[in-house]
Amino acid sequence: MLLSILYLALFIYVGLLLARRAVPDGSVAVILPLGCGFGVSLLAVLPAVLALALGFTLPAVLLAAAAAGVLGGVLLHRGVRLRGMAKDADCGALWACILPVVLITLYLLHTHVLHMVNGAYHTGQSCYGDMPMHLGFIKYIAQSGGFLPCYPLLGGEHRFGYPFLCETVSSVFLVLGADLRTAYLLPMLPAFLSVYGMFWQLTRRVTDSAAKASLAFYLFFMGSGFGFVYFLGSAEKFADIFTGFYTTPTNFVEQNIEWVNPIVDLLIPQRATLFGWCVLFPAVYLLWRFCYEGKRRLWPWLALLALPLPLLHTHSALALVLLCLVGGVYTLAQGARRETLLPWLGLAAVCGAAWLAQMLPTVLAQSLDGQHMLRLHFNWINGQDDGTLKDNYFWFYIKNIGLVYLLLVPAFIHARPRQRWLYGGGLAILALAEFVVFQPNNYDNNKLLYVWHMLGCILAAQLLVDLFAKVRALPWRALGLAACCFAAMFGSVLTVGREIFSDYQHWSANDIALADYIDANAESDALFLTSDSHVTPVFALAGRRILCGSGSYVYYHGMDYADEYSAMAALYEHPNESTLAAWDVGYVLFDSSVYGKFADADESWYAARYPVWYENDGCRVYKIK
C-alpha cells in the first residue's frame, strides 16, 4: 500500500509542476486542483502507452513512473517550483465552499466501496449496480496483463469498446501490490479534488466573484428540481425517500424524475464520469483563459491535459470538442489573424491525432458497429420510441432541473458577451444530445447534458447574486437567497441523506472466500461459466472472464451476446462436452444465483464427470480442464 501511495504522490507532484508551468500566475487554490487533473491525466497516459509494448505488467508500470520522474526532473531543471505561488484573497472561500461536500464524499466512499461489515462487503444504493463492473474491469486488466484488453464479460474475443482508462488508473495499484479497495479508491481522491476545485475556479474566473462561484458550486453539485413535491403528500410517502430503492426526489422514474444528483448518482458510482470531469473541468478552465482571455500560450497545456480524455470518458471528450468549436467561432469573430489561428490549429492537430489513435480501435469502432449505438432520438429519456413525449418538453426540464432551468433565459440576457459565447458551447452540447444518442441507453446522454447544465448554473448563480445585491435590506436579501437555495437544492439534500443511510450487502463471506481462492489458484486467462448475475464474484472480485455477463452491462455496451447467453443456458440446463469445448470453458460455478435463474440446472452431470475444484457453504466449482 505504501508503494502505491508513493506512486500516486509522484504523479500528482509532477502534475502540480505541470500546472505551475502552465499557469504561473495561479495561487495554491488553482494549482492544487489543476495539478490533480494533470496528475490523473498522466496516470492514465503513461502506463497505458508503455503497456502497448510491455503488456499491463510491473515493468510497464515502473517505467511509467520513471517517465513521470524524468518529466518532473525536466520541469525542475527549467526552474519550475511550487513555492512562491501568487496570493489569493479568495483562497479561503474555495476551501470553505467545497469542504462540506468533500467530507460527504469521503464518508460515502468509505461506506460504499468494499466496506467490510461482519465479514461481508457492503455498499450503498448508488453503487450496487455499477461498482461490480468497475471492480471486475480493474481486476481483470491487472491480473491478465494483456493490453489492449479484451472484453471480459463475454466468452471469445471481443473488442473492449468501453473507455477503459478510467479503470487502468486503479489497475496500476493492483500491479504494485495494493488490495482492491485501496486500488479502487486511491486515484478517486485527487480526481474529486480536481472536479470540485476546478469547477469553483472556472466559475470564479468566468464571473470574477467568489460568491458567485460558491453559489454556482452548490447549484450544480447539490442542485435539483421540484421532485421533492411528490413526497410531501404524507409522512409515509416522505419516509419512502429513505427506505425505498431509488425513490428519491432526484430519481423517481414513476413520475419521470431522472435528473440525478451529480455526487451520489454520477461521480461516486460512475468512474468514467468522475475521471472524465477530472480532466474536463480543468480543461474548460484552460479553454476559457486560452480562448476568451487571449492566453494563446496555453494551447499545448490544454492539449497535454486532454490527451487521454476519449478513453477516460468519451462523452466528456465530445463535450470539449463542441466547446472548442464554439470557442473557435468566437476567435474568428474577433478577426482571423495568424497569431490567433495557429494555436487553434496546433490544438486540433495534437488532440485530433492522439484521440483518433485511441478511438479507432476502441470506442469509435464500437459506436459504428456495436448494437443500438449511434442513432437519432429526441428529448433524452422524456422522448419515447414512437416519437411522442412522456411530458411536455419544457415541463419535463422544469420539474427535473428546477430553478436553474427557469432562470436560463434571463441569466443569458444578463450575462456578458464572452459568457454568452461560453454558454453557446453548452447550447451546442444540448442540441446534439437532444437529437443524437451515442449508446443503447438513452439515459446516458445525461453525461453530455450535465456539461450544458454546469454552464447554466454559472449564469444562474451570477444572475441571483447580482439581483439580490440590489436589495438594500440585508434581512430581505438573505431571506430571498435562502428561499432560492431551498427551492433549488432541497431535493438533492434529501437524496444525499438517503444515500448516507443506505446500506446493502454486496458480497457475502462465502463470495469473498471464493474470489480469494480463484485469485490465488485460477489461470489468469481462465473462462468461467457462471450465471449472468451482475454481482458474480468470479468477475467482480477475482477479475476472471465469464461466458456471459449481466445484460445490464453487455447490452448497454453495445454487445451482441445472444450466442453467449444461449450457451450459458444450455450448459446449465442441457450440458454437453462439445459446447464446453467450443467455448473453451475452464470452470463451472454452481451457487444460489445459478439456481435462482436456472431452476433445472443439471449439476449432477458435472459432478459425474469433473472434480470439485472449490467448495464452500455457498457454492461449488467444477474444474473442466
PLM regions: where:
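Membrane-embedded, hydrophobic transmembrane alpha-helices
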Residues: 1-91, 103
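Membrane-interface alpha helices of multi-pass inner-membrane proteins
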Residues: 264-267, 286, 298-314
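Transmembrane alpha-helix segments characteristic
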Residues: 102, 297-308, 323, 345-350, ...
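Transmembrane alpha-helical segments
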Residues: 104-109, 222, 226, 312-316, ...
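Active-site lumenal/periplasmic loops and adjacent helix-entry segments of GT-C-fold
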Residues: 102-279, 314-318, 504-505, 532
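Extracytoplasmic
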Residues: 472-625
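Hydrophobic/aromatic-rich transmembrane helices and adjacent perimembrane loops
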Residues: 189-192, 273, 318-321, 442-469
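Hydrophobic, aromatic-rich transmembrane alpha-helices
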Residues: 282-290, 323-334, 399-420, 466
